[in-house]
Design a protein with these regions (language model features):
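Short hydrophobic/aromatic-enriched beta-strand-loop microsegments
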Residues: 55-61, 112-116, 135-142, 192-201
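Short, hinge-like loop/turn segments at secondary-structure boundaries
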Residues: 55-58, 75, 106, 132-138, ...
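Class I SAM-dependent methyltransferase SAM-binding "motif I" and its flanking Rossmann-like core
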Residues: 2, 94-166, 211-214
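Short, acidic/turn-prone active-site loops that include or flank metal/cofactor-
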Residues: 17, 42-44, 60-67, 121-123, ...
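Class I S-adenosyl-L-methionine
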Residues: 1-20, 25-118, 224, 232-235
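A contiguous loop/helix-start segment that scaffolds small-molecule binding in enzyme catalytic cores
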Residues: 7-10, 82-87, 151-267
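Residue-level signal for well-ordered alpha-helical positions
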Residues: 50, 130-131, 185
């Protein structure tokens, strides 16, 4: 450990959705030359093998678990920049999506520390790839919303409603405890979704531990997925007609890509 006359540089690196080989080439190169790596709890051990020479510091950040306070992480990054040349803050998914990167950037910039953000693949995109279903579909889904319930759950009382945005495809991060409530509200709102709307839930997406649960919004509202969840794994909840493989009506299978026929029967 050495002290530098000028601060080191901090890289906020997106670790991607889970699998170690889904980190970007730039991210892997930075890990290989990092002096110290501050990593999220959800980062796979195999990814940390990419930085064998670096000091590795776990900083938590796991929904529902004891973790480092954000202001404490900010301070540790600033302090590390005084002692090391290359500092990596390894964040699950993409740093700029539900990663509180803005707080770290502001803290480092205020301290005169140079910061660079290296994007990563967010879990929603890996989830769509895993089930082989696009989040958008011509004639069916033109909008996608990513929603996190982590902070909202802390501030919201049990009886208060969840704010569901209006979009054709909805992807919820960290919403395991609220799945039935989400489904009930979407059905009751009668906007873009109904009881027969497809639902796909993925845990530990892109890793060897990945599990999938597929059904409908109605089944989700009945709590059918509650006993399926593994509380130790991150869950992704995907909802929308674009996720339907086939539409079955009167024993007739209609390919979801046949927009004209779909609109004729269901539009």
């Amino acid at each position: 450990m050495t002290s530098h006359s000028s601060p080191g540089k901090v890289y906020l690196v997106g670790a991607g959705p889970g699998a170690a080989d889904l980190i970007t080439v730039r991210g892997a190169k930075l890990l290989a030359k990092a002096d110290i790596v501050f990593h999220d709890a959800l980062v796979e051990p195999e990814m940390l093998d990419l930085c064998p020479q670096a000091i590795k510091v776990p900083v938590g950040k796991r929904c529902g678990k004891l973790s480092s306070a954000q202001h404490f992480i900010n301070k540790r990054l600033v302090d590390a920049a005084k002692q090391y040349k290359t500092i990596v803050r390894l964040k699950g998914g993409d740093p700029m999506l539900f990663g509180r990167a803005d707080e770290e950037i502001q803290s480092l910039s205020k301290a005169g520390v140079e910061v660079e953000v290296v994007p990563g693949i967010t879990a929603a995109l890996a989830g769509a790839a895993s089930i082989g279903q696009s989040l958008t579909l011509r004639g069916v889904s033109r909008s996608v919303a990513f929603i996190t319930l982590a902070q909202a759950t802390e501030k919201r009382g049990e009886g208060q409603p969840i704010s569901n945005p209006s979009a054709d495809t909805l992807v919820y991060y960290m919403g395991r405890k609220d799945t039935a409530k989400i489904a009930h509200q979407l059905i009751d709102e009668q906007r873009d979704h109904h009881a027969n709307t497809p639902v796909h839930i993925l845990e530990a997406v892109s890793t060897k531990r990945e599990r999938q649960w597929s059904s409908t919004l109605g089944e989700l509202a009945l709590g059918k997925a509650d006993s399926w969840f593994d509380s130790s794994s991150p869950a992704l909840i995907m909802i929308g007609e674009a996720l339907r493989e086939k539409i079955v009506e009167n024993h007739l299978l209609i390919d979801r890509g046949d927009d004209a026929e779909y609109q004729k029967r269901f539009g």
